Every structure is written in structure tokens, then in C-alpha cells.
Amino acid sequence: MTTQGGLVANRGRRFKWAIELSGPGGGSRGRSDRGSGQGDSLYPVGYLDKQVPDTSVQETDRILVEKRCWDIALGPLKQIPMNLFIMYMAGNTISIFPTMMVCMMAWRPIQALMAISATFKMLESSSQKFLQGLVYLIGNLMGLALAVYKCQSMGLLPTHASDWLAFIEPPERMEFSGGGLLL
């Protein structure tokens, strides 16, 4: 008796995934339950006779537009880690490769800032366009600041007094001294 009870309990657990399609407590309803009176033929699970209003499409489109606008706004900030890696790999020596890297690091943010009005037109459909535009602007300014810092660390910016010696007048001598002989 215990073995039969165990088998019945085991059988119930074993077919837990099965859907009971017949009977009044079943998972699916027949056409007779819907009032069509055509017998016991079954509809597929999840089928409805009524048309479901499609309001989720508009909400999904709005969410996708917001997500796309944030992707555009965060684009310059996503480039900063790669720029830091390129700065590290280029070194501080003045040669053609590091100079080209610095020029490209400076040119991309400048180009993006010159085309900022076209970018803001793409962000107009967003409800957070001001914040997204501000994030975009800050990201490009940070990229430009990294390029200026790299120029300074390479010694390309005139930040020391010795860089301006050509513009400084030589000091006037207050005294003249001669050799060690008296005449």
C-alpha cells in the first residue's frame, strides 16, 4: 500500500508540467464555455476571442527613444576610459605617434562641439533633453581637457618661464667689472 501511494505521489510530481485540458477546472476553455455552442473543440492556451488594445507599443517606443537619447548623451563619457588608455600607451615623448594621438583626442571633442546643434535636434524628442544635452557637453569638455593635459605633460604647451625667454628683455647690467690687474 505504501508503494502504491508512493507511485501515485511520484506520478503527480513527475507530470507537474502537464496542463489539464479537459474538465471544468482545466487550464483551457472550450468553445462551449465561451458561448459559441460548437462542442468541445479547444482553443490554444492563451487564446482570446476579444481584440486586445495595443497600448504597450507606444510605451515601448517612448522607452526606446529615451534609451537612444541617453546613449547619444553618454557617448563622449564612454570614450574617456579608452582615451586614458591611449594616453598611457602613447607615452610622453614627442614623436609622430603620440602627437597624432593627441591631435585626434583633441579633434573629436572639438568636432562634436561644433555639431552640437545637430545632436540637440536628435534629443528634442526626449523628455529629459536638457539633462542629456548637459551630459553630452560635459563629456566632450572632459575629452578636450584630457587632450590639453596630455599636451601639457608632453611639454607642448608653453607653461614654464623658459618657454617665454624670447619675449623677455635681457636684464641691464648695473656694474661692470674688469680683470684682476691694476694700472
Swiss-Prot record:
Keyword Endoplasmic reticulum on entry? yes
Which GO molecular-function terms appear in the entry?
A: membrane insertase activity
Pfam families linked to this entry: EMC4 (PF06417)
| Entry keyword annotation includes Signal | no
Q: Cite a GO CC annotation.
A: membrane
Which stretches face the Lumenal side? 88-98, 149-183
Where does the protein end up?
Answer: Endoplasmic reticulum membrane
Q: Which residues carry this modification: Phosphoserine?
A: 36
Membrane-crossing residues? 67-87, 99-120, 128-148
What membrane topology does this protein have?
Multi-pass membrane protein
User: What are the recorded Gene Ontology BP terms?
Assistant: apoptotic process; protein insertion into ER membrane by stop-transfer membrane-anchor sequence; tail-anchored membrane protein insertion into ER membrane
- As stated in the Swiss-Prot or TrEMBL entry, residues carrying the post-translational modification N-acetylthreonine are 2
Record-given protein name? ER membrane protein complex subunit 4
InterPro entries, alphabetized? TMEM85/Emc4
Q: Give the protein's biological function.
A: Part of the endoplasmic reticulum membrane protein complex (EMC) that enables the energy-independent insertion into endoplasmic reticulum membranes of newly synthesized membrane proteins. Preferentially accommodates proteins with transmembrane domains that are weakly hydrophobic or contain destabilizing features such as charged and aromatic residues. Involved in the cotranslational insertion of multi-pass membrane proteins in which stop-transfer membrane-anchor sequences become ER membrane spanning helices.
Q: Which UniProt keywords apply?
A: Acetylation, Apoptosis, Endoplasmic reticulum, Membrane, Phosphoprotein, Transmembrane, Transmembrane helix
Q: Which residues lie on this side of the membrane: Cytoplasmic?
A: 2-66, 121-127
Q: How does it associate, per the subunit comment?
A: Component of the ER membrane protein complex (EMC).
